[in-house]
Amino acid sequence: MLTASFPGVMFGPLHYRNLDMDKTAALKFSRGNYNKTMAISDEAKHELRRWMSSVETTFSVVSHGQADMTMTTDASKTGWECSLGGISTGSSWDLGESEKHINWLEVKAILFSLKSFTDHISKKHIKILSDHTTVVCCINHMGTSHSQEINFL
């Protein structure tokens, strides 16, 4: 029922990932039996409390309108880059980062890109272009139920 409400609850997908991961783990443990009981993590309980406390005041908009600016980002195993309005920046990954999965690197590149241009994009609607379809999906859906590490970014 939570996912059915997403069109009417702005940022709703940000607040159900732990519950969804708990459900997936429980179904795996019970071999797909929905009639079994499951444990709910403290994080999932926090998400449920948030939903219960805001159910009367949630809303969403039909459209966020046209973007004020467009930012392009890219990442590889060696580093990341981005451009905004003809200005480019980027950097190499440190050793620990370069060993991460490419999905994590692409999301991190978007985060670094936004941080790099904070002064230029503050209070603006930014369209982000990425060549990585999995990350585009992850951003559009406000996270993933498959990688807690990406959600923490």
Language-model-detected regions and their locations in the chain:
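C-terminal reverse transcriptase regions that engage the nucleic-acid substrate
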Residues: 1-62
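Flexible loop/turn segments at secondary-structure boundaries
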Residues: 5, 13, 78-80, 89-90, ...
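Mobile genetic element proteins and their domesticated derivatives, centered on retroelements
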Residues: 19, 72-74, 82-83, 109-113, ...
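Eukaryotic intrinsically disordered and solvent-exposed regulatory patches
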Residues: 54-59, 68, 113-115
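Two-metal-ion RNase H-like nuclease active-site motif
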Residues: 64-77
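Short coil/turn segments at beta-strand junctions that form active-site/ligand-binding loops
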Residues: 67, 122-125
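A short, polar/acidic, helix/strand-boundary loop motif
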Residues: 85-108, 116, 132-151
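Helix C-cap/alpha-to-beta connector motif
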Residues: 117-121
